[in-house]
Curated annotation (Swiss-Prot):
Entry superkingdom: Bacteria
One record GO biological process: response to antibiotic
Organism of provenance: Campylobacter jejuni
CDD domains from the UniProt entry: APH
Function: Resistance to kanamycin and structurally-related aminoglycosides, including amikacin.
SUPFAM superfamilies in UniProt: Protein kinase-like (PK-like) (SSF56112)
Residues the record marks as active site: 178 (proton acceptor)
Matches recorded under NCBIfam families: APH_3p (NF033068), APH_3p_VIIa (NF033067)
The encoding gene: aphA-7
Keywords: Antibiotic resistance, ATP-binding, Kinase, Nucleotide-binding, Plasmid, Transferase
Xref: Pfam families: APH (PF01636)
Lineage, opening ranks: Bacteria, Pseudomonadati, Campylobacterota, Epsilonproteobacteria, Campylobacterales
Entry protein name: Aminoglycoside 3'-phosphotransferase
Amino acid sequence: MKYIDEIQILGKCSEGMSPAEVYKCQLKNTVCYLKKIDDIFSKTTYSVKREAEMMMWLSDKLKVPDVIEYGVREHSEYLIMSELRGKHIDCFIDHPIKYIECLVNALHQLQAIDIRNCPFSSKIDVRLKELKYLLDNRIADIDVSNWEDTTEFDDPMTLYQWLCENQPQEELCLSHGDMSANFFVSHDGIYFYDLARCGVADKWLDIAFCVREIREYYPDSDYEKFFFNMLGLEPDYKKINYYILLDEMF
Protein backbone atom coordinates (compact mmCIF):
# COMPACT_ATOMS: atom_id res chain seq x y z
CA MET A 1 0.00 0.00 0.00
CA LYS A 2 1.51 3.28 -1.17
CA TYR A 3 -0.35 5.91 0.85
CA ILE A 4 -1.15 4.26 4.18
CA ASP A 5 2.11 5.49 5.74
CA GLU A 6 1.73 8.99 4.29
CA ILE A 7 -1.66 9.94 5.69
CA GLN A 8 -2.01 12.13 8.76
CA ILE A 9 -4.88 11.14 11.04
CA LEU A 10 -6.94 14.17 12.07
CA GLY A 11 -9.38 12.34 14.30
CA LYS A 12 -11.56 9.28 14.76
CA CYS A 13 -15.11 9.50 13.45
CA SER A 14 -18.06 8.86 15.74
CA GLU A 15 -18.77 5.27 16.64
CA GLY A 16 -21.56 3.39 14.88
CA MET A 17 -22.75 -0.20 15.08
CA SER A 18 -20.14 -1.40 12.58
CA PRO A 19 -16.95 -3.07 13.87
CA ALA A 20 -14.95 -0.95 11.39
CA GLU A 21 -12.86 2.01 12.53
CA VAL A 22 -13.13 5.21 10.49
CA TYR A 23 -10.70 8.13 10.65
CA LYS A 24 -10.70 11.57 9.08
CA CYS A 25 -7.26 12.08 7.55
CA GLN A 26 -5.13 14.34 5.42
CA LEU A 27 -3.12 13.17 2.43
CA LYS A 28 -1.01 15.69 0.52
CA ASN A 29 -3.14 18.63 1.73
CA THR A 30 -6.36 16.83 0.80
CA VAL A 31 -8.93 15.58 3.31
CA CYS A 32 -9.75 11.88 2.98
CA TYR A 33 -11.07 9.03 5.11
CA LEU A 34 -9.42 5.83 6.28
CA LYS A 35 -11.58 2.80 7.04
CA LYS A 36 -10.02 -0.19 8.79
CA ILE A 37 -11.40 -3.57 9.86
CA ASP A 38 -9.99 -6.82 11.24
CA ASP A 39 -9.58 -9.48 8.56
CA ILE A 40 -11.86 -11.88 10.46
CA PHE A 41 -14.59 -9.86 8.70
CA SER A 42 -13.09 -10.35 5.22
CA LYS A 43 -15.75 -12.91 4.26
CA THR A 44 -18.59 -10.64 5.34
CA THR A 45 -20.35 -7.49 4.18
CA TYR A 46 -18.27 -5.56 6.71
CA SER A 47 -15.24 -6.08 4.43
CA VAL A 48 -13.71 -2.79 3.27
CA LYS A 49 -12.14 -4.62 0.32
CA ARG A 50 -15.67 -5.52 -0.78
CA GLU A 51 -16.71 -1.93 -0.23
CA ALA A 52 -13.82 -0.59 -2.32
CA GLU A 53 -14.60 -2.92 -5.22
CA MET A 54 -18.29 -2.01 -5.05
CA MET A 55 -17.46 1.70 -5.05
CA MET A 56 -15.25 1.30 -8.12
CA TRP A 57 -18.05 -0.53 -9.96
CA LEU A 58 -20.47 2.25 -9.01
CA SER A 59 -18.11 5.09 -9.91
CA ASP A 60 -19.73 5.75 -13.31
CA LYS A 61 -23.27 4.97 -12.13
CA LEU A 62 -23.79 6.92 -8.89
CA LYS A 63 -22.01 9.64 -6.94
CA VAL A 64 -19.75 7.76 -4.50
CA PRO A 65 -16.36 8.43 -2.87
CA ASP A 66 -13.26 7.92 -4.99
CA VAL A 67 -11.17 4.93 -3.95
CA ILE A 68 -7.65 6.22 -3.33
CA GLU A 69 -6.21 2.92 -2.14
CA TYR A 70 -7.19 -0.33 -0.47
CA GLY A 71 -5.43 -3.47 0.66
CA VAL A 72 -4.48 -5.74 3.56
CA ARG A 73 -1.75 -5.25 6.14
CA GLU A 74 -1.07 -7.02 9.45
CA HIS A 75 -4.41 -8.84 9.65
CA SER A 76 -6.49 -5.76 8.81
CA GLU A 77 -8.18 -4.49 5.66
CA TYR A 78 -7.73 -0.81 4.82
CA LEU A 79 -9.60 1.58 2.54
CA ILE A 80 -8.60 5.18 1.84
CA MET A 81 -11.34 7.18 0.11
CA SER A 82 -12.12 10.76 -0.82
CA GLU A 83 -14.23 13.15 1.21
CA LEU A 84 -17.84 13.77 0.21
CA ARG A 85 -19.40 17.23 0.04
CA GLY A 86 -22.89 18.39 0.82
CA LYS A 87 -25.35 18.20 3.70
CA HIS A 88 -25.81 14.93 5.54
CA ILE A 89 -29.35 13.57 5.23
CA ASP A 90 -29.77 14.00 9.00
CA CYS A 91 -29.67 17.78 8.48
CA PHE A 92 -33.23 17.47 7.16
CA ILE A 93 -34.71 15.56 10.10
CA ASP A 94 -36.60 18.66 11.26
CA HIS A 95 -38.15 18.90 7.79
CA PRO A 96 -40.03 15.59 7.38
CA ILE A 97 -41.26 16.13 3.82
CA LYS A 98 -37.79 17.06 2.57
CA TYR A 99 -36.23 14.15 4.48
CA ILE A 100 -38.66 11.63 2.99
CA GLU A 101 -38.26 13.11 -0.51
CA CYS A 102 -34.49 12.59 -0.20
CA LEU A 103 -35.00 8.95 0.84
CA VAL A 104 -37.30 8.33 -2.12
CA ASN A 105 -34.90 10.03 -4.54
CA ALA A 106 -32.05 7.87 -3.25
CA LEU A 107 -34.11 4.69 -3.62
CA HIS A 108 -35.10 5.58 -7.18
CA GLN A 109 -31.47 6.19 -8.14
CA LEU A 110 -30.31 2.88 -6.69
CA GLN A 111 -33.14 0.83 -8.16
CA ALA A 112 -32.62 2.32 -11.64
CA ILE A 113 -29.10 0.86 -11.92
CA ASP A 114 -28.66 -2.07 -14.32
CA ILE A 115 -27.63 -4.99 -12.07
CA ARG A 116 -26.11 -7.06 -14.85
CA ASN A 117 -22.41 -7.55 -14.06
CA CYS A 118 -22.85 -6.27 -10.50
CA PRO A 119 -19.89 -7.84 -8.66
CA PHE A 120 -21.69 -8.67 -5.42
CA SER A 121 -24.89 -10.29 -4.19
CA SER A 122 -26.59 -9.25 -0.96
CA LYS A 123 -29.50 -11.63 -1.44
CA ILE A 124 -31.04 -13.44 1.50
CA ASP A 125 -29.12 -16.69 1.01
CA VAL A 126 -25.82 -14.76 1.03
CA ARG A 127 -26.76 -12.76 4.12
CA LEU A 128 -27.92 -15.84 6.03
CA LYS A 129 -24.67 -17.63 5.20
CA GLU A 130 -22.83 -14.55 6.43
CA LEU A 131 -24.91 -14.44 9.60
CA LYS A 132 -24.08 -18.09 10.32
CA TYR A 133 -20.38 -17.24 9.97
CA LEU A 134 -20.77 -14.31 12.38
CA LEU A 135 -22.63 -16.46 14.90
CA ASP A 136 -20.14 -19.34 14.63
CA ASN A 137 -17.24 -16.93 15.21
CA ARG A 138 -19.05 -15.09 18.03
CA ILE A 139 -18.90 -11.74 16.25
CA ALA A 140 -22.62 -11.27 15.59
CA ASP A 141 -24.56 -8.66 17.55
CA ILE A 142 -26.36 -10.97 19.96
CA ASP A 143 -26.92 -8.31 22.62
CA VAL A 144 -30.71 -8.24 22.59
CA SER A 145 -30.69 -4.86 24.36
CA ASN A 146 -29.51 -3.41 21.02
CA TRP A 147 -32.47 -4.90 19.15
CA GLU A 148 -35.58 -3.00 18.13
CA ASP A 149 -38.28 -2.69 20.80
CA THR A 150 -40.72 -4.27 18.34
CA THR A 151 -38.62 -7.42 17.86
CA GLU A 152 -40.55 -10.45 19.07
CA PHE A 153 -37.47 -12.62 19.64
CA ASP A 154 -35.12 -12.69 22.61
CA ASP A 155 -32.83 -15.54 21.54
CA PRO A 156 -30.35 -15.19 18.65
CA MET A 157 -30.52 -18.79 17.44
CA THR A 158 -34.31 -18.83 17.52
CA LEU A 159 -34.31 -15.67 15.40
CA TYR A 160 -31.74 -17.14 13.00
CA GLN A 161 -33.82 -20.30 12.55
CA TRP A 162 -36.95 -18.23 11.92
CA LEU A 163 -35.12 -16.17 9.29
CA CYS A 164 -34.01 -19.35 7.51
CA GLU A 165 -37.52 -20.80 7.51
CA ASN A 166 -39.42 -17.67 6.45
CA GLN A 167 -37.46 -16.29 3.49
CA PRO A 168 -39.67 -14.11 1.25
CA GLN A 169 -39.64 -14.08 -2.55
CA GLU A 170 -37.13 -11.46 -3.69
CA GLU A 171 -37.69 -8.66 -6.23
CA LEU A 172 -34.12 -7.99 -7.27
CA CYS A 173 -32.50 -4.61 -7.88
CA LEU A 174 -29.40 -2.75 -6.73
CA SER A 175 -29.61 -2.33 -2.97
CA HIS A 176 -27.54 -0.04 -0.76
CA GLY A 177 -27.81 -2.65 1.98
CA ASP A 178 -27.52 -0.20 4.87
CA MET A 179 -29.91 2.43 3.63
CA SER A 180 -31.22 5.43 5.54
CA ALA A 181 -28.61 7.84 6.90
CA ASN A 182 -25.71 6.92 4.62
CA PHE A 183 -25.79 9.67 2.03
CA PHE A 184 -25.21 13.38 1.54
CA VAL A 185 -27.40 15.82 -0.36
CA SER A 186 -25.66 18.46 -2.49
CA HIS A 187 -26.71 20.99 -5.12
CA ASP A 188 -25.70 18.50 -7.81
CA GLY A 189 -27.39 15.41 -6.40
CA ILE A 190 -27.09 12.62 -3.86
CA TYR A 191 -23.74 11.19 -2.77
CA PHE A 192 -23.76 7.66 -1.35
CA TYR A 193 -21.28 6.16 1.10
CA ASP A 194 -20.90 3.22 3.53
CA LEU A 195 -21.42 0.82 0.63
CA ALA A 196 -19.97 -2.44 1.98
CA ARG A 197 -23.39 -4.13 1.84
CA CYS A 198 -24.33 -2.75 -1.55
CA GLY A 199 -25.20 -5.40 -4.12
CA VAL A 200 -28.04 -7.26 -5.79
CA ALA A 201 -30.89 -7.76 -3.31
CA ASP A 202 -34.62 -7.42 -2.80
CA LYS A 203 -35.89 -3.86 -3.29
CA TRP A 204 -37.75 -4.18 0.02
CA LEU A 205 -34.49 -4.41 1.98
CA ASP A 206 -33.70 -0.71 1.53
CA ILE A 207 -37.37 0.23 1.81
CA ALA A 208 -37.59 -1.56 5.18
CA PHE A 209 -34.68 0.44 6.59
CA CYS A 210 -36.26 3.68 5.38
CA VAL A 211 -39.52 2.73 7.10
CA ARG A 212 -37.60 2.01 10.31
CA GLU A 213 -36.04 5.50 10.17
CA ILE A 214 -39.33 7.23 9.40
CA ARG A 215 -41.04 5.48 12.33
CA GLU A 216 -38.22 6.49 14.67
CA TYR A 217 -38.22 10.16 13.68
CA TYR A 218 -41.89 10.68 12.85
CA PRO A 219 -44.33 8.57 14.92
CA ASP A 220 -47.26 10.09 13.02
CA SER A 221 -48.25 7.32 10.57
CA ASP A 222 -49.17 9.95 7.95
CA TYR A 223 -45.46 10.33 7.15
CA GLU A 224 -45.13 6.62 6.45
CA LYS A 225 -48.15 6.86 4.16
CA PHE A 226 -46.55 9.85 2.42
CA PHE A 227 -43.38 7.80 1.88
CA PHE A 228 -45.27 4.99 0.14
CA ASN A 229 -47.32 7.46 -1.90
CA MET A 230 -44.06 9.01 -3.10
CA LEU A 231 -42.74 5.54 -4.00
CA GLY A 232 -45.98 4.61 -5.74
CA LEU A 233 -46.11 1.30 -3.84
CA GLU A 234 -48.43 -0.51 -1.49
CA PRO A 235 -46.47 -1.44 1.64
CA ASP A 236 -45.48 -5.09 2.02
CA TYR A 237 -45.27 -5.26 5.80
CA LYS A 238 -44.37 -8.94 5.84
CA LYS A 239 -41.17 -8.18 3.93
CA ILE A 240 -40.50 -5.00 5.88
CA ASN A 241 -40.68 -6.94 9.14
CA TYR A 242 -38.44 -9.71 7.76
CA TYR A 243 -35.64 -7.35 6.70
CA ILE A 244 -35.72 -5.40 9.96
CA LEU A 245 -35.35 -8.71 11.82
CA LEU A 246 -32.56 -9.83 9.47
CA ASP A 247 -30.62 -6.71 10.42
CA GLU A 248 -30.82 -7.30 14.18
CA MET A 249 -27.61 -9.35 14.50
CA PHE A 250 -25.51 -7.19 12.16
